Each structure stands twice: as structure tokens, then as C-alpha cells.
Regions:
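Mature extracytoplasmic/periplasmic domains
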Residues: 268-328
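Early extracytoplasmic/lumenal segment of secretory-pathway proteins
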Residues: 34-96
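A bilobed periplasmic-binding-protein/Venus flytrap-type ligand-binding module shared by bacterial periplasmic
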Residues: 136-143, 179-184, 261-273, 292-293
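A ligand-binding cleft/hinge motif common to bilobed small-molecule-binding domains
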Residues: 93-98, 223, 228-247
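Extracytoplasmic ligand-binding site segments that recognize negatively charged/polar headgroups
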Residues: 83, 90-209, 214-221
Length: 359
């Protein structure tokens, strides 16, 4: 993993990012237990849930955001003593860092039992499942005659959408569309297959608008009308519609075995506020609170008791919850070998370098 991260972002870039976070959080770990610092994706916790927690306990919650898993993991690899009490991370990272005793054991939390065993297993003993979903394509309905159903549509791009496509910068998701085009697993370790995927991405590069996570891109380019579709995560289209005050964005999971993501929450072992942090996670797993959160975020809840409280239209929304058959066929994000990560890092570095160098 370290080799991958060193190739992914330079040490100086990491230090700059880390220092900016420290400046934002000037109190660091000298803060009182009356506040918790949480590191998570943008737009992934309901404001009224945070307010309900503060009203109940008097403990404030400060939110800090990352926009890709690799950025967060790099920061943690360089210094586990980060000024965050709680971190949201993918299930693979949850296991990696748990092995290093970075996180608290959460098996004693009472409301942990409200989650489906499948998702509990995915996050392990030192993290709890927060949300899950699939990787797919967010697209603007007004610009498509029908939803995108093939991954090739973001690689072998139709003329009408060239220069209007967003990708993701991630060790799995960057290569995922091209690998699916090759009828390969998105987590394959085949050197030949990864090289073929690289050639496909290299050919697509002139027609890619951005490799920035779609929600980050639109927030940094609020006036843009250039984006037609983007590789994204289930639920992102609801955030896009909220941001643009429209109903134009939708989400499609192309044909093939779905690639599933799982977000887990963990408590930093070096936090001075582990008692309150664990209490906050237990609060988030209460069925009524988890239901409020899921409905706001429009993501799939791992909490089966919460799902029973959600409106029918949410539970039956196929852009959030995959049909049972497709879910059973899904590929859950899993740990890649150091050799696989290293090759992927080189490919992604080359692809993004060529993208940035284009006129």
C-alpha cells in the first residue's frame, strides 16, 4: 500500500494537505470532549441528525471532507495521529488500519446488531457499516434518449458527449469502466488485462472533462453546464439534483456484475474522546436516526431496522437498492496486492498526466 501511495501523490503534496487540515482544526487534540471531529465524504450526514445529537448530548460535531479514498488513506498512512475522532473509510481500508491497531474495537456497541450480517462482516470488528451502494453512471436525463447501460459509454464516448464525461481518480474506479469493457473483474491482477485497460483509457482521454469526483467538480465549477455524465456512486445523483435545484440527474448501474462499495465508520484509537465518539456511532445506528440519515443522503442503509421505517419509495428506489439478484451477483470491494496496486498507480499516474497535459 505504501508503494502505491508514494507513487500516487508526492510527499510534499501530502504534507500540504495535512497542514491545511491542521489549520482548519486549530484545536487539534487539545479540544474538550464537548466536540467531535469527523472526517467523511461531502454531503453524507443529515444536518438534522447532527442537530439531534447536539441537542441530546451537548456535544458538537465538526465535519471535514475528503473526495477520494486514496487521498484519505494516504494521509492516514503518513500519520495515524490525525486530529479526527471518527473517520469514514472504505471496508478494505477499515481492515488494513484495524490490523495496525489504529481503531477502537466496536463490537460492544449495542446498536451494532441492527445491521445486516453481510455489511457487519464487510467492515469487521473495528468499524461499523454506515452506507453501501454501487458504482455506476450519473447522467442528465435531458441529454440522453435512454439511460446508459454499458460501461463502454464512458470510454468509447459518443460524439455528442465528448468532452462532457467525468471519471474518478481511484485505484479501482478509474480502471473499472475499461476493465468491464474487457469482460474482466474491476479488481483483476492480470498484468495483460490492466495494460489493455490502460490503452482504452489513453484513447478516451481527449474526451474526458474531469477526473475530479463529480460532487467536488460541480462545487468548484458551479456555473458549468459542460458535464453530461460521470462515473459516480449511487446516491450522488440526488446530491447533484439538490445542488442544481433540478430533477435532471439520474443514476444507472450498467450491465454486468455490480461493483459494490461499503462505507464504514471507525473511532481513532488516539482520540481523547473515544467514549463520546463511540456513543455518537451508536446514536447513528439507532433505527430512527439511521432512517433519517438514509432518507436525506439517499443511500442504501445497512441497518435493517432502519429500512423498515423508510418510505416505500425509498426502499423500492432501484437507483439506491439493487434488486436482490443483482446484489447477490455483486463484487464487494476487496484488498488488492501490493503488486496490483503498484501497477494500477503507474497506469493512473500516466493517464492523469496525459489528461493534464492536453491542450
Amino acid at each position: 500500500v505504501t508503494n502505491f501511495c508514494n507513487e500516487w501523490v508526492s510527499y510534499s503534496q501530502m504534507i500540504k494537505r495535512f497542514l491545511s487540515l491542521m489549520v482548519l482544526n486549530t484545536v487539534c487534540y487539545q479540544a474538550s470532549a464537548l466536540e467531535l471531529n469527523v472526517y467523511l465524504w461531502e454531503d453524507t450526514i443529515a444536518p438534522n441528525v447532527v442537530e439531534a445529537w447536539h441537542k441530546k448530548t451537548g456535544v458538537s460535531v465538526n465535519l471535514y471532507h475528503f473526495d477520494n479514498d486514496d487521498e484519505r488513506s494516504l494521509l492516514m498512512l503518513k500519520s495515524v495521529q490525525l486530529p479526527f475522532d471518527i473517520m469514514v473509510l472504505d471496508n478494505v481500508s477499515a481492515f488494513i488500519f484495524s490490523r495496525q491497531n489504529v481503531f477502537e474495537d466496536l463490537t460492544s456497541l449495542p446498536n451494532r446488531a441492527n445491521n445486516d450480517p453481510m455489511w457487519l462482516q464487510a467492515c469487521g470488528t473495528h468499524a461499523v457499516p454506515y452506507f453501501w451502494g454501487s458504482v455506476g453512471i450519473a447522467y442528465r436525463k435531458s441529454l440522453f434518449d435512454k439511460p446508459p447501460t454499458q460501461w463502454s459509454e464512458v470510454v468509447d464516448i459518443a460524439p455528442a458527449h465528448r468532452g462532457r464525461v467525468g471519471m474518478l481518480k481511484d485505484s479501482v474506479e478509474t480502471l473499472l469502466p475499461a476493465l468491464y469493457m474487457l469482460n474482466a473483474s474491476p479488481i483483476t491482477d492480470s498484468i495483460d488485462t490492466l495494460r489493455q485497460a490502460y490503452r482504452l483509457l489513453d484513447a478516451a482521454n481527449p474526451h474526458i472533462l474531469t477526473y475530479e469526483y463529480v460532487l467536488s467538480y460541480v462545487r468548484s465549477h458551479p456555473q458549468t453546464d459542460n458535464l453530461h455524465m460521470a462515473v459516480s456512486y449511487s446516491g450522488d445523483h440526488y446530491s447533484l439534483n439538490r445542488f442544481f435545484n433540478t430533477q435532471d440527474w439520474d443514476f444507472s448501474v450498467p450491465e454486468g456484475r455490480p461493483y459494490l462499495w461499503v462505507d464504514c465508520m471507525a473511532v481513532n484509537s488516539v482520540s481523547p474522546n473515544t467514549v463520546q465518539a463511540k456513543a455518537f456511532l451508536d446514536f447513528l445506528m439507532k433505527p430512527d436516526i439511521a432512517a433519517i440519515n438514509a432518507e436525506y443522503i439517499r443511500a442504501a442503509s445497512p441497518n435493517y431496522k432502519a429500512r423498515a421505517l423508510l418510505p416505500v419509495e425509498h426502499r423500492e428506489d432501484l437507483s439506491i437498492y439493487l434488486p436482490e439478484q443483482r446484489l447477490a451477483e455483486g463484487i464487494i470491494d476487496s484488498e488488492l496486492s501490493a503488486k496490483n496496486l503498484s501497477l494500477r498507480a503507474k497506469i493512473i499516474s500516466s493517464v492523469t498526466y496525459q489528461y493534464e497535459a492536453k491542450p
